[in-house]
From Swiss-Prot:
UniProt protein name: DNA-directed RNA polymerase subunit omega
Gene3D superfamilies named among the record's database cross-references: 3.90.940.10
InterPro entries: DNA-dir_RNA_pol_omega, Pol_omega/Rpo6/RPB6, RPB6/omega-like_sf
Subunit structure, as described in the record: The RNAP catalytic core consists of 2 alpha, 1 beta, 1 beta' and 1 omega subunit. When a sigma factor is associated with the core the holoenzyme is formed, which can initiate transcription.
Lineage: superkingdom: Bacteria
Biological role: Promotes RNA polymerase assembly. Latches the N- and C-terminal regions of the beta' subunit thereby facilitating its interaction with the beta and alpha subunits.
A molecular-function term among this protein's GO annotations: DNA binding
Gene transcribed to yield this protein: rpoZ
Intrachain S-S bonds: none
Recorded GO CC terms: DNA-directed RNA polymerase complex
EC number: 2.7.7.6
GO terms for biological process, alphabetical: DNA-templated transcription
């Protein structure tokens, strides 16, 4: 399993604060609302999966805002 770093995620998100909000929203979607992960699960916690999705550029804040509507 590759380790996800904040720097990997910041290539796709403007700042650390937005990263925290984005990752927490996505992790909540995966764990509580049954959304399917966009990366392989690999027995990780939902927060790690969310960070891996962000680092891969698969999740953006715009996508999550649209999903809330």
């Amino acid at each position: 399993m590759a380790r996800v770093t904040v720097e990997d995620c910041l290539d796709h998100v403007d700042n650390r604060f937005e990263l925290v909000m984005l990752a927490s929203k996505r992790a909540r979607q995966i764990s509580q609302y049954g959304k399917d992960p966009k990366v392989e699960w690999e027995n990780d916690k939902p927060t790690v999966v969310a960070l891996r999705e962000i680092a891969a550029g698969l999740i953006t804040s715009e996508m999550l805002e649209q999903d809330e509507d």
